[in-house]
Regions:
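Solvent-exposed, non-transmembrane regions of integral membrane proteins
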Residues: 1-228
Length: 228
């Protein structure tokens, strides 16, 4: 829509073919078992569970990794909840760990997940007062794979990524956002289209200024050589 709220037909059409998010490795942290506040509250302590992680420590608790499933779904029985690989929309990152207290008297084993729009998160309760939780995984980069058609007859496929806009027929198409409630399973991509009709004149002006500087430099050099 324009400034008057009227619908304006764009000179190009965009169809989203695929949206991809690449996330940072999952993290584990301690939280208050009653309030859910991170521990420490001001500067939460975390450990990164990447491909090299085996053991770590959170506020004195020793954490041992038993299993990590990047895309999983819960399998619930009467007494337990297990996680199995599940490569479908809404899958969660599930980590099975064993946590041992600083004095070695308490040992807990269980699953921790960050949850998704489809499944709730799961924490591992340690001593009734604190639990181990997994915060939402942070996006490292995300991009849209699009099909583009213009009134001028252009038909192309392209990738648009944050800080890597697509330029086409005087337009710049930026990757702006996505449906954060769906996370990496988002089926919506937010793009921003920007057109500056004065941009070619700006570039032309800059080019003329650069040429003028070159000619001025050459002219000064010739005058200097003539005097010598």
């Amino acid at each position: 829509t324009n400034d008057q709220g009227k619908i304006v037909e764009m000179p190009l059409a965009i169809q989203l073919k695929e949206f991809e998010i690449y996330e940072y490795p999952p993290k584990l942290m301690l939280v208050n078992g009653k309030t859910g506040d991170p521990i420490p509250k001001d500067k939460p302590a975390t450990i990164v569970v990447d491909s090299t992680f085996k053991t770590g420590e959170l506020q004195g608790w020793r954490i041992k990794l038993n299993k990590c499933i990047d895309e999983a779904a819960p399998l619930m029985t009467r007494d337990t909840t297990n996680y199995l690989p599940w490569h479908s929309s809404g899958a969660v990152t599930a980590i099975n760990i064993t946590a041992t207290s600083p004095d070695g008297k308490v040992k807990k084993t269980g699953w921790v997940t960050c949850g998704s729009y489809h499944f709730p998160y799961q924490v591992l309760s340690l001593d009734g007062k604190i639990s181990i939780a997994m915060p939402e995984r942070e996006p490292q980069r995300y991009l849209s794979r699009i099909e583009l058609m213009t009134q001028a007859g252009l038909h192309a496929f392209a990738d648009i990524e944050v800080n890597s806009p697509l330029s086409v027929e005087g337009w710049k198409i930026y990757q702006l956002s996505y449906d954060t409630s769906m996370g990496r399973w988002s089926e919506t991509s937010v793009l921003e289209l920007v057109r500056d009709p004065w941009l070619p004149f700006v570039y032309a002006g800059l080019g003329m200024m650069m040429l003028g500087a070159v000619f001025m430099f050459l002219s000064l050099q010739r005058r200097k050589e003539t005097k010598e």
